[in-house]
Amino acid sequence: MLRYFVLFAALVLQGAAAFAAGVSREVFPLERGGVQLHLERYQVGEGEKTPLLMAHGLTYSSHEFDVDYGDYSLARFFADNGYSVWLLDIAGYGRSQKVQDGFMPNSDYAAEDIAAAAKRVLELTKAKKVNVLGWSWGTVTSGRFAAKYPELVDKLVLYAPIVAGLVKADVTAPFNKNTWTHAAGDFQVKADKTIDYDVMEPPVAATFLSNCWRYDGEGSPNGGRRDLLVAPNERLIPTAQVKAPTLLIVGDKDEYVTALLCQEALKTLPKGSELKVIKGGAHAMMMEKPYYKAFREAILNFLKK
């Protein structure tokens, strides 16, 4: 099954994309603590744009926001809607400089990488504040960033928020061994455990998987994984300290978080915060055919309020 994706990926990457023609991409130098970080802007046209900084999840880097097949790319969607979209790779991930200690870029460390990126974005755009969107582990890192640096954040979007520890387990290896099977682990499956192609189009899956291999290779840091694999009664996002209006958006089939946990978190967030539950959506719903449009429209509507 995964062999099909590898063979199909070359064709996919050559295919036309809905936003490709009008979106410009530019990489901006960024260094923190002696580590070179990859910070890339997606934008349509010139002039003032509202900045939106995206924080990736565990294991795989910011390319997950640019699944450039059809109109699935989240980064290009928001660029097409008037935002300057900024993708950051945390230290040790993707196109950022590799690290010797895979436990070093944990959640608190990553939050400081996000802070460095946010300050750089504000310097470049002359905006007063930045909007931030985090996915999965990126909700922990961006949530901690927003709590510590409220003066930098306009609105916060926590997509598939890892509100609490997943399960207590020891993480002893500093780096995760990446595999094709692991990269496909967030795709919805049928009863026989094969990928549900009614939910995830084969070219979308192929694009995502080929990018995982291209940008993330055979390993990624495990500091964040060690943070997440703690007891379920441990809260990971300091929502009570967040001052920015926040959107919690989750699929009701997400295996990592429940709507109940999100409702609990919502009660601690400031006025103007919201919870949106996408029925049928799972952890990777930004790539799921029945749900990706409703997902991103909900985010766009929240940011424009």
Where are these regions (language model features)?
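Short beta-strand element of the alpha/beta-hydrolase
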Residues: 49-57
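Short substrate-entry loop that stabilizes the transition state in hydrolases
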Residues: 58-69
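Catalytic histidine-centered segment of alpha/beta-hydrolase-like enzymes
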Residues: 281-292
